[in-house]
Regions:
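Outer-membrane beta-barrel translocator domains and adjoining extracellular loop/strand segments
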Residues: 46-53, 116-125, 158-164
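Membrane-embedded beta-strand positions in outer-membrane beta-barrel channels/transporters
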Residues: 10-12, 87-91, 132-136, 170-172
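Short loop/turn motifs that connect adjacent beta-strands in outer-membrane beta-barrel proteins
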Residues: 18-34, 95-105, 144
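Outer-membrane beta-barrel "beta-signal"
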Residues: 164-177
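Membrane-embedded beta-strand positions of outer-membrane beta-barrel proteins
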Residues: 34-38, 90, 106-108, 137, ...
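Extracytoplasmic loops and strand-loop junctions of Gram-negative outer membrane beta-barrel proteins
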Residues: 68-75, 119
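Transmembrane beta-strands of outer-membrane beta-barrel pores
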Residues: 17, 38-44, 92-94, 110-116, ...
Length: 177
């Protein structure tokens, strides 16, 4: 068993624009929110050990077993000492959209893992080159009925990305009483 100390960190900011601000005014929305979050994982000496990183063989602790059990679909590169990435979200809100009692909130989010591969599942799980984009819309009817629909596309990071073919659509409906 190998034990290494890990340092993780993140910094984020949220910007909320009101009706009279230029962004909502340009979009014709009532408000808009922009969220930025950047993070990192530092594990000194991680690249010196056969630590599994996130990826197709991430659940198999022995790198030789990972290569054998995944039929050679693996990468000999292990976790990196430093890995980092960022996330962005933008969502304008339209109260009483189209003259109805609905509030519509379209959104777009972006993920980009810039550098390094995080070790194991207990860290922030950065995978160098991974990108993800989501577009969606939320509908709120007088804070009683709510519905959401979104599509997520995951790409980048080549064969190291176990989720490259897992684009998905998500839908939900809820009622508050």
């Amino acid at each position: 068993m190998i034990e290494l100390d890990a340092i993780q960190g993140q910094i984020g900011t949220v910007k909320l624009w009101g009706t009279s601000d230029p962004i909502p005014e340009l979009l014709g929305s009532d408000t808009a929110v922009f969220i930025v979050n950047a993070g990192f994982v530092y594990v000194q000496g991680a690249s010196n050990y056969p630590l599994n990183r996130v990826g197709p063989e991430g659940a198999i602790r022995n790198p030789f077993a990972a290569a054998l059990l995944t039929n050679g679909v693996t990468n000999a590169q292990y976790a990196d000492d430093v890995s980092y990435g960022y996330r962005l979200v933008f969502a304008p809100a339209y109260n009483n959209a189209f003259g109805t009692p609905f509030t519509l909130t379209p959104s777009v989010s972006w993920r980009h893992d810039l550098q390094g591969n995080s070790p194991g599942p207990n860290t922030a799980n950065y995978l160098q080159g991974l990108k993800q984009v989501s577009i969606g819309i939320d509908a709120d009817y007088q804070s009683t009925w709510k519905g959401s629909l979104s599509y997520t596309n995951i790409f980048g990071a080549g064969f190291d990305n176990p989720t490259f073919d897992r684009d998905f659509v998500m839908a939900s409906v809820s009622y508050a009483f």
